[in-house]
Amino acid sequence: EAPEAMAVDAPRAEREPKRARTDVHAVAPAAQAVQVPPRPKDAGWEDLDKDDVDDPLMVAEYVEDIFAYMRKIELQCMPNGNYMSMQRDLNWNLRGVLADWLIETHAKFRLLPETLFLALNVVDRFLSLRTISLSKLQLVGVTALFIAAKYEEVLCPSIQNFLYVADGGYTSEEILRAERYMLKVLNFDLSYASPMNFLRRISKADNYDIQTRTVAKYFMEISLVDHRLLDHPPSLVAAAAVWLAREVLERGEWTPTLVHYSTYAEDELLSLIHISEP
C-alpha cells in the first residue's frame, strides 16, 4: 500500500495536535486571588453620626478616631487575669469582698460610675505588679478609690471621709504614702477606658433607651465582682451588658448598627454572656 494512503488513513488523534493539560495546582492561587471578600459583620449599618455634624459637643468628625484610640488603650490598661497566683496571702474571694466594699463605699459617697470602674482597675493592675499582705488589702482599696475620685470627680471627698469609711484602720499619712507608691508602680498611668465610655457609644445605636442603659449599667457594675472577667476588655464587657439588657427587656435582635457601634457581632458576645454557666 502506498505511503500516501497510509497517511490519509492515520488515526484522528495522531493528525490533531495534543491539547495542553490544565495544571490545577497552578490555577488554584489565581482562583483564590479573585475570591469574593467576606461580608463585613456590620453590613447594612446606619450612620448615626451624620446627624451630629453641626453639634460641636458631639465631635462627629473625630468620634471614630476617639473610640479607635480608646480600644487601643483599653488593652494597655488591662490587669493580669491570673495575678492571684503570685499573691501569698490573698485569694479571689478576698478580692470579691474588697470589690463589694468599694461598691458600697462608692454608693455612700455618691460618686460617678467612672470612679468605681477606675478604682477597681487600679486595684487589679497594682496587684498584678506587687505582692501584698492581707493587712494591706483594704489600704490598697481605699487608696485606689481616693486616687480615682481625684481623677474623675469635680468635688473629691476629703481624705477624712476615706479615713472614716476605713474605720480608723489607717492614718492620713499611710493613705498618702500608699497613694504615691501605687501611682509610681502604675507609672502614673490612669488613662483607663472604662465600660462606661463604650456604653455611651453603643447607646447611640440603641436610641439611648433609658431602660436598656440602666439594666446594662447594673450588669457592668456586678461584673466588677467576678474576677473571671478581668481577661476581657471593657468594650466587650459593655457590649455584652447591652446585649443581655436587650434580651431581658425583649428589645429585639442585635442589629448591624449595634454591631458597628459596639464593634462586636452577636457570636463574639456569647462566650462572655455564658461565662458564669457551670
Where are these regions (language model features)?
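Acidic, serine/threonine-rich low-complexity regulatory regions at protein termini
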Residues: 1-142, 146-276
